[in-house]
Design a protein with these regions (language model features):
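Hydrolase catalytic cores
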Residues: 300-303, 320-326, 350, 515, ...
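C-terminal subdomain of the subtilisin-like protease fold in secreted/lumenal serine endopeptidases
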Residues: 353, 426, 555-568, 605, ...
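Structured lumen-facing ectodomains of secretory-pathway proteins
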Residues: 232-241, 246-252, 256-266, 283, ...
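Surface-exposed binding patches on compact interaction domains or structured appendages
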Residues: 702-712, 735-770
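Subtilisin-like serine protease catalytic core
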Residues: 78, 97, 204-333, 347-350, ...
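Autoinhibitory propeptides
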Residues: 12, 22-28, 128-212, 216-219, ...
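Short acidic, glycine-rich surface-loop motifs adjacent to enzyme active sites
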Residues: 319, 341-365, 388-389, 507-514
Length: 770
């Protein structure tokens, strides 16, 4: 038997047992800051054989860091750059977290107090002295930003040569090289026979009607590509205002927005009770309407929109809309995102939605960046940071020999920053709709990928095929009856010459292998030969993203190499279709894999992000897919849980509310199963699919010492002992003794059945014989 290669991060699906978990807060049923909890009675030990792992964690980290430095530091000394220059003094949020959180309920309250304003003034004086020094030495050309709320720093224009010199000054604490975050992109389509929970409206937006919470008394800041505030989804006004026009008037002068737009007035930034603040940090004006992007409007609609077409997750939440991507160039800059984050903190938001990022994110940005620390300060102040894991598939995607990794190098992690930062809750995507399947030869369940149109929208294979049939057959299908078709395996790669000895395929489905000619050409040749549909199977491992171009093609789909090889082993066979043949939904293939380079668990939670219908600029609606859509779905759930916690436990601090929200989410998530009925790896789904109902109705939740998330990160086994100790606690929220059953499911990466050289990105369950 060949040795199995075990990936360094294993699945620990813990359905917890606690023989006697007694409530420690019986009097008021409120969790304490440092609760006395009942730990699981015995530490669980799992022995792992790792003899086949060739690279140490240090070797892998060294290689990745070297590649990252080469990529990001490829500057000439004369190149103009933007850098954040930090000073030694505390920022407002640091002072709040360190000393003033006992006096002020939120960092916003402190920052807008007399004490906070005085501190901000002192910070500005120190920054002015530094600017004078830098200009006197000829090291900078322009000051972009003055930061005081979440970081004590200035953003300046300089050259890369001067950047290195600035970092050596005694008056400078550190320098941060500006990074560029990807302009959010949406993706169309997803498919993967097991039924997972579908708790969404027909739009794919999370259905929150099972609870009474609607988001009243909460505020969400959305950092994105632009917004159409006039859309009907934003016209229903909330029942309760946290931020009023008076609040905006009182603090506007202290906000970064005012520092860049001289004479900025309330009428410029206050849109409505629903949208109390808007500003474009990338282009330095109050016009947040996007130049050429529907992304931000779509995201905001998912979180809190409401009209006769869509219902958002938290319809009564207020939305602070912050445009951080420029109109005429790609990429959001670190300095603009920091400026928006500062103003979001000043406004006192509950949560910040960031459907943006760069793939293969690190725990800290290049050059010893302090950005991670900034996010940690925001988290410490009690604001929930909800971020997209990114749409980067796996690290093997797009490779010359397949879309998955070799078994000798199974590291598939592409999860992106800022979701890799400790403070950020990293969100993976599951489809918002179930997946159709076909039964091949009476026994094989066949999942497929839709082809895309020239506009990158998914085609609809089943409906296109059924609509091409006689009316009698159409009625049978729509009434739930089965339709069976014959398929014919075409030799070679589906070129004209390959049909020479096939015979008549009129009314049949052509099974064609990928390779040599285009997908469009394969489908057109099959059509000309009389086929009613075409199935293209991959010649390498992984899925096919298939565009059919502008031609009038027959219905065409793609399937995996493994499935296609089984079908092609027969010259002919049958394919049975039925309108009720639907399963899932399943994890989105585009959703980035973890872990982080330091073997941290990211993503941490899953939400619906595949084929989500929401608002777009101009009053319209569209279906988009991406972790960018999963993130607002999760963000809406987060603010509803925060509303629940604040109402049930009013004495908790903002920090306690944020921590408990994450722990409830991760403790009660539903484990997502793949088409084989096995759990997806936590490197793909995190804790599982978020459940609002479970979160607000659970009698207990899990905590882990030393971390504010309900997760166990085993990291590396440096001494190669093969033994991991895992300890966690159960917090009992009820007045009764709770008993749970404990089970542990260990799993590893399965190997492709077609060549045994590539991982299949599917789970293989471990047992005593493995």
């Amino acid at each position: 038997m060949k040795k199995k290669i075990l990936y360094g991060v294993i699945l620990l699906l813990l359905i917890i047992t606690c023989p006697s978990c007694k409530n420690k807060n019986k009097d008021n049923n409120v969790p304490s800051v440092d609760p006395v909890v009942t730990p699981i009675s015995n530490s669980q030990k799992l022995q792992i054989l790792k003899s086949d792992l060739k690279l140490t964690q240090e070797q892998v980290m060294s290689r990745i860091k070297a590649e990252n430095i080469k990529k990001n530091n490829g500057y000439l000394d004369t190149d103009e750059i933007i850098t954040m220059v930090t000073l030694d003094g505390e920022s407002l949020i640091e002072s709040y977290n360190n000393r003033y959180s006992v006096l002020y309920k939120t960092v916003s309250e402190y920052a807008n107090s007399a004490t906070g304003i005085k501190q901000a003034s002192k910070i500005k004086e120190e920054q002015d002295l530094l600017v004078e020094e830098l200009k006197g030495k000829g090291l900078i050309t322009e000051v972009e930003y003055y930061y005081s709320t979440i970081i004590n720093a200035i953003a300046v224009k300089t050259t890369y040569g001067n950047f290195k010199e600035i970092g050596n000054l005694a008056s400078v604490k550190s320098t941060i090289l500006s990074d560029t975050y990807n302009l959010p992109q949406s993706i169309s389509g997803d498919a993967s026979a097991i039924v997972n929970l579908v708790d969404v409206y027909e739009t794919g937006i999370f259905d929150s009607s099972s609870v009474s919470y609607k988001g009243a008394g909460t505020v969400v800041a959305v950092l994105d590509s632009g917004f159409d505030c006039t859309h009907t989804v934003f016209q229903k006004q909330p029942t309760e205002q946290v931020i009023t026009d008076r609040d905006i008037s009182s603090i506007l002068g202290n906000m970064n927005a005012s520092k860049f737009t001289k004479g900025l007035e309330l009428k410029d930034v206050y849109y409505s009770r629903k949208i109390p603040f808007v500003y474009d940090y990338a282009d330095k004006d109050s016009d947040v309407f996007p130049y050429d992007s529907e992304h931000g409007t779509h995201v905001a609609g998912i979180i809190g929109g409401l009209d006769d077409k869509i219902t958002g997750v938290a319809v009564d939440t207020q939305l602070v809309l912050m445009k951080v991507f420029p109109d005429l160039s790609e990429g959001g800059k670190t300095e603009d995102i920091l400026a928006a984050l500062e103003d979001a903190v000043l406004l006192g938001v509950d949560a910040i939605n960031m459907s943006l990022g760069s793939s293969c994110g690190f725990a800290r940005e290049e050059d010893g960046n302090k950005i991670n620390e900034v996010y940690e300060r925001i988290n410490e102040s009690g604001i929930s940071l909800i971020t997209a894991a990114s749409n980067s598939y796996s690290s093997g995607y797009g490779g010359e020999q397949g879309n998955t990794n070799f078994v000798t190098n199974p590291d598939s992690g592409t999860v992106g920053s800022p979701s890799t930062y400790d403070a950020a809750l990293s969100v993976a995507s599951i489809s918002g709709v179930k997946s159709r399947y076909i039964i091949a030869n009476g026994e094989q369940v066949l999942f497929y990928k839709e082809s895309n149109s020239v506009t990158a929208k998914p085609n609809d294979f089943m409906n296109e095929l059924v609509n091409s049939l006689p009316l009698e057959q159409q009625e049978k299908y729509r009434n739930g009856e089965k339709l069976t078709f014959e398929y014919v395996t075409i030799p070679g790669v589906g070129k004209e010459v390959n049909y020479a000895n096939v015979g008549d395929i009129t009314g049949k489905i052509a099974l064609v292998r990928r390779g040599d000619n285009s997908f469009e050409e394969k489908a057109m040749i099959a059509k000309n030969k009389g086929a009613i549909a075409c199935i293209i199977y991959n010649n390498i491992d992984g899925d096919i993203l298939m565009s059919m171009g502008k031609t009038e093609h027959i219905p065409t789909i793609s399937i995996s190499k493994d499935d296609g090889t089984i079908l092609a082993s027969k010259n002919t066979g049958t394919l049975t279709m039925r309108s009720t043949y639907q399963a899932g939904p399943f994890m989105s293939d585009f959703s980035s894999w973890g872990p982080t380079p330091s073997l941290g668990i990211k993503p941490e939670i899953t939400a619906h992000g595949g084929e989500i219908m929401s608002a777009i600029p101009g009053g319209g609606y569209d279906k988009l897919s991406g972790t960018s859509m999963a993130t607002p779905n999760l963000c809406g759930i987060v603010v509803l849980i925060r509303q629940y916690i604040k109402e049930k436990y009013p004495t908790l601090s903002a920090k306690q509310v944020a921590v408990m929200t994450n722990q409830l989410l991760m403790s009660t998530a539903n484990i997502v199963l793949d088409e084989r009925g096995n759990p997806y790896s936590p490197r793909k789904q995190g804790a599982g699919l978020a459940s609002l109902y479970n979160s607000v109705n659970t009698k207990a939740y899990i905590t882990v010492d030393g971390i504010d998330r309900s997760k166990l990160e085993l990291k590396d086994d440096a001494k190669r002992t093969g033994i991991y100790n895992m300890e966690f606690n159960l917090i009992n929220l009820s007045n009764e003794t709770l008993t749970y059953d404990l089970s542990v499911v260990g799993m590893t990466e399965s190997v492709s059945t077609s060549d045994e050289k590539h991982v299949a990105e599917k789970s293989q369950i471990l047992n005593g014989n493995t």
